[in-house]
Amino acid sequence: MEFMREFSDDAACLDWLWRSRFSKDGHTAECPKCERSRRFHRVASRPSYSCDTCGHHLHPTAGTIFHKSSTSLQLWFYAMFLMSQTRCGISAKQLERELGVTYKTAWRMLNLIRNQLMDETGDGEPLDGDVEVDETYYGGRPRAYETRTSGRGRVRRTWEKTPVLGMVERGGRIKAEVLPNAGGATIKGRMHHHILPSSMIFTDELWTYNGLEKTFKGHRRIKHSARVYVDGESHTQTVEGFFGLFKNGVRGTYHAVSTKWLQGYVNEYAWRYNRRNARQSHFAALLAQAAA
């Protein structure tokens, strides 16, 4: 197996981090104490490297999701490898079986990978060009406590669904965020944060999107209420396709996701979407992000 050949044990994983973060040749690195390049050697009793001159220690895992984790470094790397090999992700239950760890540990590992390594909502590079924008709502059937009493004393069930906003460049990247509400101010605020004013915006006819032509290059709408889904270049099929992939993937792999952790799963699917045409493998991309 290719993974085991490259990362046969914790020492091999630590050496990869050391070379990626501090020492290209595996021997010399900039010593903060000496303030110059020095030779370092591996400390046998701890996951660090020591300067041959002054004894200062450098820790390859410092500032990463692996730092001070009781889970072995090889298992962390293998979790990222497994997560990168599927189109729809891997559940905590399956990872528990694959790694031989507890469900709690598996869930925590996946949660950190999604929210630390796959989160691109804060990416400073905004979207540009032709940008499709749409919102979807995530949530299942209401539970027993999700009821409201109407004025006539009748109990009715409510659907507490969570809005997710998607913004995608045609042929390019996507930004997707879980929103606290689907109000116009909230949606437009996120759009202005992630999309350049020089962009042409494509949306449906929802009133929330009124007035976008004032702050962007242009705004074209498609009238879904009239059963029109494509009108020349006006459509939102790209972003709708992403939402379909996301919902089908979550339903098939994770079955259900709570609102509290929903952004992490949105991060995961957006991260994969943004690398659909990349030459670099998803595993290599995750490793690079972990070492950044």
Q: What residue spans do the PLM features occupy?
A:
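Residue-level recognition of single "structural anchor" positions
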Residues: 1-292
